[in-house]
Amino acid sequence: SVEERRLVAETVVRHAAGRVPVFVHVGAWNLRDTVELAKHAAEIGADGIAVVTPAFFSVRDQGLVDYFTTVAKSVPQDFPVYLYAIPQCAVNDISPKAAEECSRLCPNIVGIKYSYPDMTRIQQMLRINGGQFSVLVGPDHLFAAVSAMGGDGVVSGNAQIIPAYYKKIWQLLQEKNYEEAA
């Protein structure tokens, strides 16, 4: 429920206590709940939000742009918003053109978590805003490759279980030791 999600977000932000950035996923089954969760995340001191595409019914690019910009405009202009595409689960994919339009219309839309293993599309996302659009991947096996191409990392469930492994990969990537990182 929205109330449960609000409570989880409050608990995480409180316990993180500024030690690590907290981005709250606010995507919901409808725009009203998504906007409510986005505003709540900003109010409780989260560092930003991620918003998944609408699920179930297919939406054209303009519908996605309208959806994401509505959410982004509901929070302060300096509050970072990440788009989140996982088309294999949520039906809708975000085209690079739509992502770039979202970022143009709302400068607080700063990046995307792209969770589909389409390297061509990821390369296109990396070129948005002259390469200043943050690109995170979801599939763990793309972490090193996309980071080597200029991506900003991975959002990984596995990293919660074996963080030392992912920290080591990140350190190797920062050292540009791509062979060992892979």
Residue ranges and their predicted role:
Residues 1-91:
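Active-site beta->alpha loop and helix N-cap motifs at the rims of alpha/beta catalytic domains
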Residues 73-79, 86-182:
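Catalytic alpha/beta core domains of metabolic enzymes, predominantly
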